Design a protein with these regions (language model features):
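Intein/HINT protein-splicing elements and their conserved insertion hotspots or analogous self-processing inserts
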Residues: 1-105, 117-223, 231
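Cysteine-centered functional microenvironments
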Residues: 97-109, 310, 341-342, 346
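N-terminal beta1-alpha1 cap of cysteine-dependent amidohydrolase-like domains
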Residues: 150-316, 320-332, 340-348, 411, ...
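Amide-donor transfer/coupling interface in amidating biosynthetic enzymes
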Residues: 137, 260-262, 303-304, 337-472
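Short helix/loop capping segments that flank catalytic or ligand/cofactor-binding pockets
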Residues: 11, 17-22, 73-76, 122-124, ...
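Conserved acidic residues
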Residues: 6, 268, 425
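Proline-centered loop/turn at the N-terminus of a beta-strand
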Residues: 133, 310-312, 423
């Protein structure tokens, strides 16, 4: 966390002298060594672990990293790699060891933690009471470097330069796997595309703001059905998101629809979840779409549902591919949009930034102007759209046009579309996997401990409220 009113501490778990045997540093010199670090006192190790757990449970640690391959300097660098700004100024004068090579590269078990200065006395007391040794290392700085000093010697490590060195092995492997120059694009862009957040002023992050609670045990009367096919795997997260937002959730399989056991007449919202229907052997969602198109009862149930004026639908990932395949988003278009393989021709699983443009949709309309983080996990997520962008009701765009911020190469960087009337929505990213701050790959530091939910829950609440108005 780039905050000057914080301090970094080293906590040793080994109770041993610093040793280089078996370290990455030794291996880089073509050696192994025979003097390796060890945990000398198992009880001390336990005490150190439990003391750190107490700090974690009390919310006293802002950031932390273990010391493992590469030693202390690698730990410090990797803590900086998580941000695009700032660095550290580190003094090793309080370390008993005088050999700076051992201090920086020994892999003795330990951790580095970052503590707010207002909590440092409480942290020190917890560690001292547990008999755990710790050393103050230094503080964050606005400069993009790590400045390490020991006595009269000072060493400077450029964070961005070292980050590229650190990432270069991944790039070389990626180059063997990715197509269309995506490996090079990732290497050039990964540090230029931070996930940015911008919440609407009225968002408070509390369940009470939406009048919802996870403790609800009585039916709301607003029913949604999750439709799944063999290979669907995202239904549980989706069911909980809908339930938390106030829906009564029903499980409907394709077999139910094909046999006529379910007709969708008793629900006002249907959701097609993510996964790999029919193992994608015919292409993503092709077999699933065939289940609707070539089975009379399933097709009749779907057609009647979309003919009603009091219905909503949502397709996520594999469900988005299904909706596009069935032409449910833009049935008025002569040329149908398609979902194609990612430009990289790899399965992309990553946490990306989304921007919600001003849009006409039931679920995302109130989120217009927001910037949020979200997970993607797909192999065929590229929107191929035959018309100009203004012909579509765009509800979500990747925050960056270039790969990997746009993980699939979608036209116009589109991540989600809605029907012209805003009732039916298809998107590749998984909003149901980001409704809580702890689910997010990153989240605003000043909110992650206070927010109960993220703005994504609002989309589900909007859907429930819209239906309540329609069926009143």
């Amino acid at each position: 966390v780039n905050n000057e009113k914080t301090t970094l501490y080293h906590i040793d778990f080994s109770f041993d002298e610093l040793k280089l045997g078996g370290s990455a540093f030794a291996q880089s010199l073509g050696k192994v060594g025979d003097d390796v670090p060890c945990v000398q006192d198992a009880e001390y190790f336990r005490d150190a672990f439990l003391a750190v757990q107490e700090l974690v449970n009390k919310g006293l640690i802002l950031a932390g990293h273990d010391i493992s391959a590469g030693g202390l300097i690698t730990t410090l660098l990797e803590m900086c790699f998580a941000n695009v700004e700032g660095g550290m100024e580190i003094s090793l004068d309080k370390m008993k060891e005088q050999d700076i090579i051992k201090i920086l590269f020994a892999e003795n078990p330990g951790i580095v933690i970052q503590i707010s200065d207002k909590h440092k006395e409480e942290v020190k007391k917890i560690l001292e009471d547990a008999g755990v040794g710790f050393v103050k290392l230094g503080k964050p700085t606005d400069e993009r470097h790590i400045l390490v000093s020991k006595g009269d010697a000072t060493y400077q490590f450029g964070v961005d330069y070292m980050r590229d060195v650190w990432y270069s092995s991944s790039y070389l492997l990626d180059r063997k796997q990715s197509m269309n120059g995506c490996a090079k694009a990732r290497f050039e862009n990964y540090k230029m595309q931070p996930v940015e957040f911008a919440f609407m002023p009225e968002f408070k992050g509390k369940l009470s703001q939406y009048g919802i609670t996870p403790d609800r045990r009585t039916p709301s009367g607003i029913r949604a059905a999750i439709i799944r096919e063999k290979g669907t795997n995202g239904e549980r997260e989706m069911a909980y998101s809908l339930y938390l937002a106030g829906f009564d959730v029903k499980d409907v399989t394709m077999t139910d629809l094909i046999s006529g056991r379910e007709t969708l007449e008793d629900v006002n919202m249907i959701v097609y979840c993510g996964g790999f229907s029919n193992s994608d052997v015919l292409g993503s969602a092709k077999g699933w779409a065939g289940g609707f198109l070539f089975n009379e009862k399933a097709k009749e149930a779907l057609d009647k549902f979309y003919a009603r004026e009091d219905t909503l639908s949502l397709g996520i990932c594999n469900g988005c591919q299904l909706m596009m395949e069935l032409g449910l988003i833009n049935p008025e278009h002569k040329k149908k949009g398609k979902m194609l393989h990612n430009d990289s021709h790899k399965f992309e699983s990553t946490f990306v930034g989304l921007t919600i443009p001003t849009n006409r949709s039931v679920m995302f309309g109130s989120l217009s102007g927001s910037k949020l983080g979200i997970w993607v996990a797909h192999g065929e997520g590229k929107f191929y759209l035959p018309y100009d962008e203004d012909k579509y009701n765009v509800v979500a765009k990747y925050s960056y046009d270039e790969y990997p911020g746009n993980p699939n190469g979608s036209d116009y960087s589109i991540a989600g579309l809605a029907s012209a009337d805003g009732r039916h929505l298809a998107m590749m990213p998984h909003l149901e996997r980001a409704i809580f701050p702890w689910q997010n790959g990153c989240y605003p530091a000043d909110r992650k401990n206070s927010d109960q939910v993220t703005p994504w829950i609002e989309a589900f609440v909007n859907a429930r409220k819209w239906i309540e108005e329609k069926v009143r």
